[in-house]
Amino acid sequence: MQFKQDFFEQLEGFYSQVYPLPISNPHWLGWSDDAAQLIGLEKPNAELLMQLSANYAAPGASYYAQVYSGHQFGGYTPRLGDGRSIILGEAIGPNGAWDVALKGGGPTPYSRQGDGRAVMRSAVREFLVSEALAALNVPTSRALAVIGSDLPVWRESQETAAITVRLAKSHIRFGHFEYFFHSEQGDAAKLTQLVNFTIQQHFPHLSTDAAGYKQWFYEVVQSTAKMIAHWQSVGFAHGVMNTDNMSILGDTFDFGPFAFLDTFKEGFICNHSDHEGRYAFGQQPGIGLWNLKRLAQTLTPIIESDDLIAALNTYQFELVQQYLLLMRAKLGFSQPNQSPNAINAEEQADLGNKDLQLVGQLTGLLETNQLDYTNSLRRFGQLDPSSAHSSLRDDMVDLAGFDTWYQAYQSRVGEVADVNAWQCERNSANPKYILRNYLAQEAIIAIEENGDNSKLLQLQQLLQRPFDEQSEMEDFAKRPPQWGQGLIMSCSS
């Protein structure tokens, strides 16, 4: 890897230099060729293993942990920071630079009495979900590798430590801006320095002046809305949408007790610490805006309040438009720009409202009838929209409700000239395979009990091609067995 050190060299006082501690008996549990290509790597090798397990120093690495704060479950915590993630620097790839971080690399000044380690189960889950979301075209950080060890660590019981090698276009979070806004007591120098750095590194088309700051925040609002629209469309629940877990680039990261929906449930909670359902699946769009408002507050020294409010007011529209774009592709609705006759803005808005109503009625039917979200949407790839019968009806208990919806659906889709092509388009928009919690758990158990990572590798391969039939992997598309239904994870890692 070839590193540059822009954050380390230009933002002194925004981090603490700290060196990772090695893990014993390191071994590859998983490796992503796709992620490796992003930073110009090819195959894993023994020397790289020793570098990424902190047994050898990586040439050109600086090793540091960033400081930030954040709102956690709605309450402000004035000092957080990287408690178990140590950044090596920005690795230069063929199409840009990516931060390389060792998640589980050991204690830092921000560990808050923790050991700075990650347990194998959380490292494996982060590796797999990074692969899964990337293949689903959801904006996300990546995981280059997961490295196992025989180093014991204590959580509720003894487990083994592991390291996830995370790649991110940036590790700058909403919480970075909160920290320097609240801790500098009205001195905007460091806040301005951070905004300028963020723009120069990641928004180079913008200027570092009042006009540039205004446009930058608008683009942050837009990218956040787009990310969450993607989450809602694929049934992804993040679980811990604290502001310190929000990327300034609108990429998904900081994976903890996440889950994909099995049975559709608007109020699904995947984090057993979320007693009030603050971060429930259906709450995510609203929390995205709440978090953006916390970010906007920090920017008041450099951006006019009216401009911040104007940008925030675009969030809901952008979220809905992105969600509509994705759901129309899933259900086979023509996009407004595909219409043979141009329609004006008022007609587009009316069509959008009707489409949202149809989508909401469908998800309502899925919830009422306790149906699997992913499998139900995949059925549209076998549907002839001109046929009076839909196989989706066979799963319904509320037949009258479905029939009413289906008639409206057929009217919206209209006549389809080439049914086979239409079905292929639906299959390219609706995945057959997702990372179900029980599948990840089976891979983890195989490693824990037998040191066998074959299930992990099989699952990784499957998730890299979620839209393909992969008929030999059919069992992975089934609804969870009884023991795997509604698994709720903890933040313990």
Curated annotation (Swiss-Prot):
Designated name of the protein: Protein nucleotidyltransferase YdiU
Enzyme class: transferase
Naturally occurring in which organism (per UniProt): Shewanella frigidimarina (strain NCIMB 400)
Nucleotidyltransferase in keyword set: yes
Binding annotation for Mg(2+): 245, 254
Cofactor annotation: Mg(2+); Mn(2+)
Entry similarity comment: Belongs to the SELO family.
Transmembrane segments: none
Active site as annotated: 244
Reactions catalysed, as given in the entry: L-seryl-[protein] + ATP = 3-O-(5'-adenylyl)-L-seryl-[protein] + diphosphate; L-threonyl-[protein] + ATP = 3-O-(5'-adenylyl)-L-threonyl-[protein] + diphosphate; L-tyrosyl-[protein] + ATP = O-(5'-adenylyl)-L-tyrosyl-[protein] + diphosphate; L-histidyl-[protein] + UTP = N(tele)-(5'-uridylyl)-L-histidyl-[protein] + diphosphate
Keywords recorded for this protein, A-Z: ATP-binding, Magnesium, Manganese, Metal-binding, Nucleotide-binding, Nucleotidyltransferase, Transferase
Origin superkingdom: Bacteria
EC number: 2.7.7.-, 2.7.7.108
